[in-house]
Structure formats: structure tokens, C-alpha cells
Amino acid sequence: MKKLSLLLLLVIATSFSLLAQDAPNPTLNTAIRKHGMEKSQVMDIASWVCDVYGPRLTGSPMLDKATDWAQKTLKDWGMSNVHLEAWGPFGRGWEFSHFEMHATAPSYFPIIAYPKAWSPSTKGLVSGEVIYLQADDEADLEKYKGKLKGKFVFLDTIRTINEWFDAPAKRLVAEDLLNMANAPAPGRRPDRDFNRLGGFSFNQKLFKFIVAEDPLAVIDRGFKGDLGTVFVSGARADEGRVQDPKAKVIPQATMSVEHYNRIFRLMQKGIPVTLSMELKATYTNPDGMEHNIIAEIPGSDLKDEVVMLGAHFDSWHTGTGATDNGAGSAVMMEASRIILETIKETGIKPRRTIRLALWTGEEQGLLGSRGYVKDHYANTSPEGTIQSLKEAEQSKISGYFNLDNGTGKVRGVYLQGNPGVMPIFRAWLDPFKDLGATTLTMQNTGGTDHQSFDAAGIPGFQFIQEPVAYSTRTHHSNMDNWDHLVADDLKQAATVIASFVLHTAMRDEKLPRKATELKAGSN
């Protein structure tokens, strides 16, 4: 009984100790709120990132210009150790300077369409008939042999358009947040579905066949988007990566679904359709290397330890990369500025070094952040699989905070299956309940750079954000522009994140970690 009582007292004492060190500092939060909500610069930062230096395709000259601007801005604010860290090789970059597409027969109409990134130039203004290639296997391809040259190839059928009886933008409601909060901790990820490899293999053969037949261009209509919104990403090569200078690539474009459907219906009626198209594009980045932007706010007594915040700086090429991810980049830069102003106002210095990272190559597979983790925290195989940890640095990072889900305000944090941080983050969220930040979920979320850190046994977190019109209108689309950023939401996000980062830097201990099977290796 005495042993049980002593154990209970120990648990209670430990809990009180945890609560004490994680109680939010009201002096810090007051200053953070003032500089984040009342003296915000986030929309001006976003305008520079998007209006002046958008879009920022990895490997493009515009990304290089944006990188120079970001470094200068961070230095002017007073951040330390501002520098670039190389990763790669990535391969060739790309930019386009002119694009047009028209239907010229049976009647004229201008077409809304955009080239896919890494498409080569056409040979001036080219004109030809549209052909629909319908093939389910290699035998079907034989009937198209010798028939694609000088043609525009359609690969998609008609996509039905459903009218927007509900608003394309939305906010999370109480039920949404409750469901997230009640979600169980993630289990083991399912094994890869190897049954799908057959279809994937045929798609590779299909594209290799098309490239060999040398049509004028391949055109699709995307799987979503309407009302002139076109979602566009990168071209495909006959094999391998389009960034490989030796890859064979033909012009490719995505057309608005309304125009694509109209042309398809004309062809169904036996009416030939002729298009004209011109694309002027240039391959760039001859050395093949890319860079992440790194900047720091020095720590004090625990300066050898680090807390990181970051966002990907690169974008796709048809909009200006505003919600993806100029918003996240602007917020993380603004959060860093807020922390600097808070330090000046309060005289309270962070104990750990705060390190900002603006990643590149995220849109091609988290390449910049994975390269950084490889250089600092983990040993990887040639294929990129993490094999062991570089303990000297990996043991000194407390955590990484990421933002990459659009313009929406922060509603909480995805804990990425890490129960140890729940009481800590609950305490840190509490002062921002009035701003709508209330929810913690054990759920994982993917598709962005915190995964690179999580994979290396480092606490890595993405914030829960309001969806707004991210998936329906702006993500990877031609409408991803500054005008779709919500100022009050971005102010709130920068404020909440600045508080989380600074409180992480002030803790006596690093953030709790999940169990990992990864072992220490060579540094």
C-alpha cells in the first residue's frame, strides 16, 4: 500500500512538473499577439513572395530571384546565419515565356489551357487535328501506329461537371473538429498494393509509345476544376524523370474541362476539330543543384539544441503559388519576425536556437527537406530510405513545425501519433481559444515536409488549418493567386505558430519523441 501511495505521489509530482514547465508565458504571448495581430506584415510578405516573385517552380530563375529576396529580407530583420544549403542533383529547371491555344475548325474559339511544366517548346505556332487515343492494352496501341504525328492527342473522356450548389469554400465546424479530436492513434500503414503495378506499367508503355510517335502535343482535362479553373502540374517523359536532361519529353498541356468536353462531343458527332498551339519554353539550372534557405535566431543556455519551423517555398507554375505555398512561407517568415520583435520588447531570449527553413523541391516529392534531413539527421540508402540516425545532430533537435495547407487559420495540430506532446500542446493552445485554435488530433497528415522529420524519429508537426477553397479552387491551379489569401487567417496562424515555436525553445526538456526502431549510425 505504501509503495502504491509513493508511486501515485510520484506520478502526481511528475504531472505537476510537466504542467509547470509548459504553462504558457503570458508576457511572451502578450507581445506575440501585439506583433502578430496588430502589427502584422504577413500580407505584404505574401505579396512579395507571390506578386513579385511568383510562380517559383523548382529549378526556375524566378525561384532563384525569390531566394535572393528572402535571404536579404531575413538578414534585414536581424536573423543570423542566413545561408543556402544545397541538395540534389535535382536536374534541369524550366520556365515558359509564351503560350496560346485556339480551336480553329469547325469554328474558332479561344481555349483556356496551360502547358505542363518541363514541356519543350513547339516548333512555332503548330496546327493539327485532334485524335482521341483509346487503348486498354498494348494490342490496342498498334492501331494508332503511324497515326499520331501532326496530331493533338486526347487521352481523357468527357468529365461530368456538377454545378456548385454548395459553396466551394468552407470552414471547419464543431463536428469536424470533434471527429478529428476523437480519431484514434494511427496504426501500421498498409502494405503497398502491388496489384496496381500492372496498370501503372501499361501507362508507362502508353506514354513511351506516344512519345515515339511524335504528336504535336498531348492534352488532358485534369480530374477536377471547372469555371475556368485549371489544375496543372508537370509533364511526363517517355521514361524516368522529366528533370533529367536526357529524358525525351513532348509538349503537354491541360485544358479547361468545358473546352475539352466541347471538343470531345464534336468528335463524337464525327466532326473533325483542328487546334493551333504555340509554346515557348526554356530549360534552366544547368548545374542541376537546388538550395534550401536557412536562417536562425540564436539561443542562449541551450543554444546547441534547435527547434525548427518551415514551409516549402517552391510552387507550380500557372498561378503565383499563393495558397501553395506562399501562404505557408509568408506565415513562417512572419512568425520568425514576430519572435524577433518579442525578444526585443521583452528582453527574454530563447534558450534553444530557432531555425527557419524555406524548402524547395517539395512539389516533386519533399526533395529539399529530405535532402536536409539526409545531410543532418539520418543516413539513407541510394534509394532514399532512412537506414540509421546521425545521432550527434538528431539528438539535439527538439521538433519541427510545418505549414502547408493553404490560407486557412490554425485550428490545432496533427500530433502525428505522438501522445507525449498532447498535454504540452494543450497548454500552449489554451491562450488562443478565442482565435479558434482548440483541437489536437492523434491523426497523421501527409504530403508535406514534416514527414521528412517524422521519418527520422524527430517530432514533426503540421498544423490543422481551415480548408477555405484550397482543394476546390486554388491548390496547384491557375487561380492560386494573392487575392485568395485571407488576411485575418494568416495573421492568426503566424501568431499561434510563433508562440508554439518560442515556447518549444524555452522548455527545460526537448519535446517527447515517439518510439523508433531506427538506430544510431555514423555521423
Could you say what each language-model-derived stretch is?
Residues 22-31, 47, 51-186:
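Noncatalytic luminal/extracellular "stalk/propeptide" segments of secretory-pathway proteins
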Residues 188-199, 204-207, 211-212, 217, ...:
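Active-site-adjacent substrate-binding region
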Residues 5-17:
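Bacterial N-terminal signal peptides
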Residues 44, 338-367, 400:
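Short helix-loop-beta-strand segments that form the rim/entrance of peptidase-like active sites
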Residues 26-28, 113, 117-143, 238-322, ...:
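Soluble metallo-hydrolase cores and metallopeptidase-like ectodomains found primarily
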Residues 1-5, 21:
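Positively charged n-region of N-terminal signal peptides that target proteins for export
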Residues 26-60, 231, 314, 404-408, ...:
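N-terminal capping segment at the start of a domain
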Residues 108-110, 123, 146, 150, ...:
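Metal-dependent peptidase/peptidase-like ectodomains
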